[in-house]
Amino acid sequence: MGDRYSQSKWQEPAICRILDANLDRAREGLRIVEEWCRFGLNSAPLAGECKQMRQELAIWHTQELRAARDTPGDVGTELTHPGEEQRSNIQQLLQVNLCRIEEALRVLEEYGKLYNPDMGVAFKQMRYRVYSLESNLVVHRRHQLLERSPLYLVTSASEQLFGTVEAALQGGLTLVQYREKTADDSVKLSHAQKLRQMCHHYGALFIMNDRVDLALAVDADGVHLGQQDVPIAFARQLLGSQRLIGRSTTNPDEMQRAIAEGADYIGVGPVYETPTKADKAAAGLDYVQYAAKHAAIPWFAIGGIDPNNIDDVLNAGAERVAIVRAIMQAEQPTLVTQYFLSQLTRVQTLRSIEARVSQSHV
C-alpha cells in the first residue's frame, strides 16, 4: 500500500519514525484488548473486531516505515511515568490501552496526511471504530458481570455504610445497590461517588436506587427502579444502552411488563415480610417458583432473606438473591457474604450438573 508513495517528498525520517512508532503502539494496544475479549469475555465478535483492525494496521506498516526506526536514538524511550507501572484491575488496564490506541490513531491520522492522504482517512475511520469498540466493551462487561453475580447487596442507612460495603466486597461481592431514602441529595451524591469508586476498585458493579440523575452524575453502572419510579423507556433514553436498568416486581404481571419494557434484570419479592418494604405484603415462595419457570432475564429473589431461610428460597428455584439487613447489620459482613456466596455457588453447580446429565439422556 505504501509502495506507490515510495518517492513522496514527505519521506523525512522524522515523519516515518512517528508513523512507525504509533503503528506499533496501536497494534500492541489492540492485541492487549483482544486478549481480554477472547479469554476474559469469551466474545468472538469483539475479539474479531480487534484482530481485523490489527491486520489493517499491519498493511500500512510498510518496510519503508520500519526502516526509519531508530530505537537507540529515540529520546522517548527514557521517559516514564509512575502510573505506567501500576494497574489495579482489568478495567483500568483496558481503559489505559484503549486510550493508547485512540491517541495513536489520532497521531497516525494527522501525520498520515503528510505521508499518504489515504492514510489519514483510514485512521480517522478506525478511530471511530475503536470508540464503538470501547462502548461495546463496557456494555458487554456490565452484562457479563451481572450474569455472573449471584449475590446483590442493597444498602440501608448505616453509620458503618462504607466499612460494611467494603467488607462485603472483600468477601467476593460483585454487585451493590446504593439505597437511601431520607438523606439530602448532597449526601446521596457524596455517598454514591465514594461507593462507586469503591465498587470499581474491587471490580464490582455499582447501581443507584431510583435516581437516574444521580446515576449519571456519578457514572454508575445502572439504576434500579421501583414500580412507582419513571418508566424504563424514559430511563433508557437518559442512560443510553450502556447502563443497566433493574425493576422491582411483586407479581407475574409486573414481571412480564418489566421484561417487555426492556429491563436488564428484575427483583422478585418481597419473598418474606421486611421493614425495607413495610407497605408490601410478602409475595412468598410461590412467586419465586413462578420466576424460576418464566423469567427470561436475570432475576434476584429479595425481601427478608437471611442465612436461616436461604435454603428455602434456593429450593424454590432461585439462583440469585438480593440481601439487605443480613449483610448490612452483620457483625462480620465478610463472613456472611462468603456464606451466601458458597450456598449460591453450590446450588448453581448442582443445577448445572443436573442440566448436563439431563441433556446427555436426550
Task: Specify the residue positions occupied by each region the protein language model found.
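Glycine/Thr-rich beta-alpha phosphate-binding loop at enzyme active sites
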Residues: V218-L225, G246-K293
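Active-site mouth loops of central-metabolism enzymes
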Residues: I90, E147-F162, R243-T249, A301
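Structural preference for solvent-exposed beta-strand-turn elements
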Residues: G2-D24, E28-R142
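Conserved, mostly hydrophobic/aromatic
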Residues: I101, L153, A168, V176, ...
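Glycine-rich phosphate-binding active-site loops on the catalytic face of alpha/beta enzymes
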Residues: R179-K181, Q227-A235, G267-D279, I310-Q343
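Short, acidic/polar
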Residues: S156-L169, N209-D213, T250-R257, D306-D311
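Alpha-helix-loop-beta-strand connector modules within alpha/beta enzyme cores
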Residues: L189-D210, Q227-T250, D279-P307, Q338-S352
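N-terminal amphipathic alpha-helix/helix-capping segment at the start of soluble metabolic enzymes
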Residues: A14-R17, V121-K124, Y128-A167, A233, ...
